[in-house]
A protein has these predicted regions:
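Enzymes that bind and transform nitrogen-containing heteroaromatic metabolites
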Residues: 1-142
Length: 142
């Protein structure tokens, strides 16, 4: 989470309603929030403010016209899948474990379309139950 916090601070985060619900009504500090939902009402507030858009295209349009902040798509699975078409850079955390009965997954990525910029491995330790790798990719120019 420290990497997520450092990376997204000062940016705009776009997420689906279920991901937003997982925040338990908290607004993450130092970030603009856009929630993609057809059920939330525009302008609702819970411990801060956020914008509601009905689809990813309108969320991206709002983010691009309202600020020059970097934009991060932070989930869930269907928002990730749809957002991959627009992504210029990927920040992936690969955790070296198998989760039994998992129901949500990051979509498959064709890495032949991307340049690996960095891969930083971390061992399991007292703070991390499993080893993991932080990976950064940039989209290849066509």
């Amino acid at each position: 989470l420290a990497m997520f916090k450092a990376l997204t601070a000062g940016g705009t985060i776009i997420m689906g309603r279920k991901t937003f619900d997982s925040f338990n009504g908290r607004i993450l500090p130092h970030r603009d929030h856009i929630v993609i939902s057809r059920t939330l009402k525009k302008g609702m507030k819970q411990s801060g403010s956020y914008r509601v858009c009905s689809d990813l295209d309108s969320a991206l349009q709002h983010a691009l016209t309202e600020s020059f902040n970097p934009i991060f798509i932070i989930g869930g699975a269907s928002i990730y899948k749809e957002g991959l078409r627009e992504a210029k850079k990927l920040y992936l955390t690969r955790v070296d474990t198998v989760v039994e009965n998992a129901t949500a997954f990051f979509p498959e990525v064709d890495l032949s379309e991307w340049h690996a910029v960095s891969k930083i491995p971390f061992p399991a330790d007292e703070k991390h139950q499993f080893p993991f790798t932080l990976e950064t990719y940039v989209r290849k120019l066509v």
